[in-house]
Structure formats: structure tokens, C-alpha cells
A protein has these predicted regions:
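Residue-level detector of Asp-centered blade-edge/turn motifs that repeat once per structural unit
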Residues: 49-52, 109-111, 153-156
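Conserved beta-strand positions in repeat-built beta-propeller and related beta-rich domains
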Residues: 1-9, 55-66, 108, 114-121, ...
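Surface loop/turn motifs at the tips and blade-to-blade linkers of beta-strand repeat domains
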Residues: 24-40, 94-100, 139-145
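Short loop/turn segments that connect beta-strands within beta-propeller blades
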Residues: 16-20, 85-90, 128-133
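Beta-rich catalytic cores
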Residues: 8, 42-43, 78, 101-103, ...
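Short, conserved, GDST-rich strand-edge loop motifs in beta-rich repeat architectures
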Residues: 3-6, 57-77, 164-199
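Asp-box/WD-like beta-propeller blade repeats and closely related beta-sheet repeat scaffolds
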Residues: 2-71, 79
Length: 199
């Protein structure tokens, strides 16, 4: 069998049993309203595969490179997206935009939806890709005590959720004050910025 992997800064790749590395995709459809070309995959992060072979994967941010993730957090905008690669026709398309650092994804037990973690949103959401609710998004867990970094289906049908760090009141307050964040970015050295409590 092949191993499909998300490689930050490069895209979606496949490793064959013979250890051959193949690029599956490194771009998706461009946002029609975007001034900047956002078709290149900057930070492909996590993936899962639907029963029909479609690969759903998260791209944490379309604005920043891997080493610039703190700036994405400070900006506190929905720069992330969920992308789908369909091996049946070789197409890649964005299925959800405007997400706050989607950083973890898994096909749900219903096999018609995916669960994904939004790190800066401190939440888990569901996106229905098949069935009567196809295209809908719903909140599953909101206001988590920490920053979710991954979600996986457990062998017993439940889910494992990893938190990369716990929330801090000072950072939560700063996220509600865009003027404060802007002044901090302009006047304070990067290594002294207020950051989330990441392990």
C-alpha cells in the first residue's frame, strides 16, 4: 500500500512500498475573490481518506510559510482551508475556506463527514462531504480549554483529540483586541510577542 503524507511547504505526497516519493498535488483552485494567488499549498498539515479514495486534508494557512505560524495566530483571521484531492479524475479543489488554523482532520464514523480541529478557534467542527447534508458545516465542540492540534478516530469508535497547549487568559484577551495586537506587532520584537501557551 502507499503512504499519503502532507508535507508543510510542499503539498500532498505519496510514498510507495518501493520508497519512491511522488507528488500528488501542490496546488488547488484559486479563490476567485483573492488578490494574491492562493492556489499554491503553503502549509498542508493533516489528512484522512474517504471510502471512495478522496483525500481530505487541512492547510493551516494560505498566507504564511511554516516558520511564520505565530504571525498567523496573532493575525487571528481565518487563513486556513480544507482541500480535497480526488484520485478518480486527479482534481484538487478547496471545499472550505476561512478557517482558523485547521490542524487535524479525520473521516467521521458516519463515513459521510469529516471532523477537523481549528487550533486558533479552540474548537472541533464537522463538514459533511456526502449524504443529505453535503456541504454543511456544524460546530461539534466549542471553547476547548486548549489549542487542538490533531483528531483521530479510535478503534472503539470514539475520537482522540490532541491539545498542543492550554489557553491563557492574557492571550485570549489579546485575541479580542485587534488594536493591541497591531501595536504589539509594530513596536515589540518578534521574540517578545505574546504567544499562545504552546507545548
Amino acid at each position: 500500500f502507499n503512504l499519503n503524507v502532507c508535507v508543510g511547504g510542499m503539498g500532498l505526497y505519496r510514498v510507495t512500498p518501493e520508497r519512491e516519493v511522488q507528488r500528488v498535488t501542490d496546488e488547488t483552485n484559486r479563490s476567485w475573490a483573492s488578490i494574491n494567488d492562493d492556489s499554491r499549498l503553503r502549509l498542508a498539515d493533516d489528512l484522512d481518506i474517504a471510502d471512495d479514495g478522496r483525500i481530505f486534508f487541512s492547510e493551516a494557512t494560505v498566507r504564511y510559510e511554516m516558520h511564520e505560524w505565530p504571525v498567523d495566530g496573532l493575525e487571528a483571521r481565518g487563513n486556513g482551508r480544507i482541500v480535497c484531492y480526488d484520485p478518480r479524475d486527479g482534481s484538487t479543489r478547496t471545499v472550505l475556506r476561512g478557517l482558523r488554523f485547521p490542524n487535524g482532520i479525520c473521516v467521521a464514523t458516519d463515513r459521510q463527514s469529516i471532523l477537523f480541529a481549528e487550533t486558533w478557534g479552540c474548537c472541533i467542527k464537522r463538514y459533511w462531504f456526502d449524504g443529505p447534508r453535503a456541504g454543511q458545516v456544524e460546530m461539534v465542540l466549542d471553547n476547548l480549554p486548549g489549542y487542538p492540534d490533531n483528531i483521530n478516530l479510535a478503534s472503539d469508535g470514539n475520537y482522540w483529540l490532541a491539545l498542543v497547549g492550554m489557553r491563557a487568559p492574557a492571550y485570549d484577551l489579546a485575541m479580542r483586541m485587534p488594536g493591541f495586537r497591531k501595536r504589539m506587532a509594530q513596536r515589540v520584537a518578534l521574540d517578545e510577542w505574546l504567544f499562545p501557551n504552546i507545548n
